[in-house]
């Protein structure tokens, strides 16, 4: 997982990692200590205080979604290897990897050893992030060549280039994190902002309005709310 630094931090021990506010750090292990994470920045790694950072969700992590929903979403993808990681339905606290291959969706249980390392087969990793990166170039299956690739996102388009699916009644969500637009057509917002959803037809990117602006935003940055406006 990645995290954004909320404050400057200067290391006071050899095994700590210094960083500046706004830096994007790669979190390697969230279970080393209750108050410290192990992270990497600019090729260096060390421990960082967890209250100095804000976790940035990956587009491939979908949390508590049912197996059937994962199959429905991945079934719409065009390319083999499109994947997501979800929390296991049968084993709370564990994770499952769902991957599109051909006309089917395959599911792999993410295993953990006594030291807390993650693995599918033999090679073990400190984090889900490392496992995903490894299997982008090494097959997740022993029977077929399946390499992980991100789910396709909605291209940034304008005007009538793409028909939108409008909810029958206004739907509102609230931002869990700050989001700064990276491309034209994206909608920026701050944590806590309310956004009216005008198109939720894609599993990854929704279209909405906030403070008079309209654009696309990542759906895993928001949470549904019950709000009459």
Swiss-Prot record:
Subcellular location: Nucleus; Cytoplasm; Endosome; Golgi apparatus
Keywords, comma-separated and alphabetical: Cytoplasm, Developmental protein, Endosome, Golgi apparatus, Meiosis, Nucleus, Repeat, SH2 domain, SH3 domain
PANTHER family for this protein: PROTEIN ENHANCER OF SEVENLESS 2B (PTHR46037)
Gene Ontology MF terms in the entry: epidermal growth factor receptor binding; insulin receptor substrate binding; phosphotyrosine residue binding
Coiled-coil segments on the chain, per record: none
Swiss-Prot/TrEMBL domain comment: The two SH3 domains and the SH2 domain are necessary for the reinitiation of oocyte meiosis.
UniProt-reported outcome of changing residue 215 to R: Unable to reinitiate oocyte meiosis
Annotated function: Adapter protein that provides a critical link between cell surface growth factor receptors and the Ras signaling pathway. Promotes meiotic reinitiation during oocyte maturation.
InterPro entries: Grb2-like, GRB2_C_SH3, GRB2_N_SH3, SH2, SH2_dom_sf, SH3-like_dom_sf, SH3_domain
Protein name from the UniProt record: Growth factor receptor-bound protein 2-B
One matching Pfam family: SH2
GO cellular component, one term: Golgi apparatus
BP GO terms, sorted: female meiotic nuclear division; insulin receptor signaling pathway; regulation of MAPK cascade; signal transduction
Domain SH2: 60-152
